[in-house]
């Protein structure tokens, strides 16, 4: 089950389509969907979590808590929409594209992809780009 929760005024459009997309990416990697909770929040909310749970006193766009068991993919993914907006501006992409990239980034971590080394970062980017193409295809069908 995939749920979308909001700790800010932000609200996703096309929740159903995004849920199907995330499910498809999970299945494409030979995994099963568990309970995935997206929590959209602001910088202050995510900074508090970053300090409390990771002992990092820095802003970030995403924090994910992985509860995956074997092939069952699940966890809580906290996303700062403020940080996503700033990053979109820095990377010269739309807010929506950056948000979708960050959303799937958390799931890819649950599937087993890392971004700790330059090589694994390249692979993560490839996986994100492939997932974004899947979303484009899915949205053109609907």
For each predicted feature, which ranges?
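Short active-site segment of divalent metal-dependent hydrolases/proteases
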Residues: 104, 108-112
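An acidic/histidine-cluster motif and surrounding catalytic segment
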Residues: 1-99, 111-142
